[in-house]
Amino acid sequence: MSLLDLPTLWNASGVEALDSDLFEYFCCVASGSLPTFGHDATALRNILVRTALEGETASAAAVLQALLAFSSLHRYGLQPQALELKITALGSLAKGSFTPGLGTKETIEHIAAGMLLSSFEVHQSSCTSGHWTGYLGGVKTITDMSSVKTLLQFSSDVAVLLDWVHYHNVLARFSLLYWNGEETSEFPSTPTNLLSSQDSSLPPPIYSMMDLLSQICDLSNSAIPTGTSDEVDNYKGFLKVLDWRIRSLPIKGDNDGEMLLMKLYQLALLLFLNRSFEGLIDQPIRMQQQIGQAFAILPRLSSCRQQFPIYVIGCEARTDEQRAAVLDLITKTEKMSTSRSFNHCRTLLQAVWTQDDLAEWDDISYRAKLTLVISRCAVAPIFV
């Protein structure tokens, strides 16, 4: 695709000649590596590019600069050009924040810039990439203060942007359940489901998966009832309903690869729910069957860009064969131009396996196990 393929209402004159290469590279290549699940990659690219080029505000300039920074990082790795563009984007975003009473257009620009900056930080999963929580937390604060209905009325494809925000919010909450670092204070803890299923651009099963994962995180972050037997029974009943809802998800896809990926995500949700509430959900035979199904799927996938299912299922790997299947899928995925680094995911899995082999997890809860491992990271990981 060339710039001539972009809709004519986009005027790229705001892109400096030296940056036009990076702009086209973002449109053709780098945008495909933005962490998503179930999103239309072209639609996401389109709203980001349009937001960057249509506006004349400081926050619109921040979108363009953050877009170019991500493109530079994707193409050349972490080097001065990418860092300078990121710093320039932060300056423009700060300048735009002083505008009294952000309008709808400026709000969308702030959201787009913040998400691109967050994506910049998590792309390489390096020891300096811990600022993603601050950027994502800022985006969440803006969306919480905004009228979603007004944002959707501004443009039909804003739903794509808000779904992208929600996906990152949910996976961030999963990570921060087990993270003891300072970054947790930068991220608002209140769950937010930005869009109804009718307004969302996501396929219904994927929308439901994100909603169910969010609910499991809510429960994991709250105290388990220890009162009357009725309270405990009601709690167990709700967990069984969640388990049933996940198992009842209609798994559909345009091809076998999509269906296998969605099935893998479904199995990861079931395992996460069952492991998080061991003792309250007692179905060991069914869980072992689900683990077997998950490991049977791994070698059939050509790639899996989504890191949550790989991590959750990888934590169940006990044999060399199972671990090799996980690492092989990670390797195949990282060879794709649309993949981001699996550094954190791979390192965390290897730490879990080492401790499993040493039998150091006896009499320790699933939450304590994940907390011990994830909190060893220098910065909070995110499994998008």
UniProtKB/Swiss-Prot annotation:
InterPro entries: Fun_TF (IPR021858). Pfam families: Fungal_trans_2 (PF11951). Coiled coil: none annotated. Keywords: Nucleus, Transcription, Transcription regulation. Iso-A82775C is a precursor for the biosynthesis of the anticancer natural products chloropestolides A to E via a Diesls-Alder reaction with maldoxin. In the absence of the prenyltransferase iacE, siccayne accumulates instead of iso-A82775C and can also be condensed with maldoxin to produce chloropestolides H to K, which show also antibacterial and anticancer properties. One of its GO terms (biological process) is positive regulation of transcription by RNA polymerase II. GO terms for cellular component: nucleus. Its main location: nucleus. GO terms for molecular function: DNA-binding transcription factor activity; transcription cis-regulatory region binding. It is found in: Nucleus. It comes from the Eukaryota. Transcription factor; part of the gene cluster that mediates the biosynthesis of iso-A82775C, a enylepoxycyclohexane and biosynthetic precursor of the chloropestolide anticancer natural products. This is Transcription factor iacI. It comes from Pestalotiopsis fici (strain W106-1 / CGMCC3.15140).
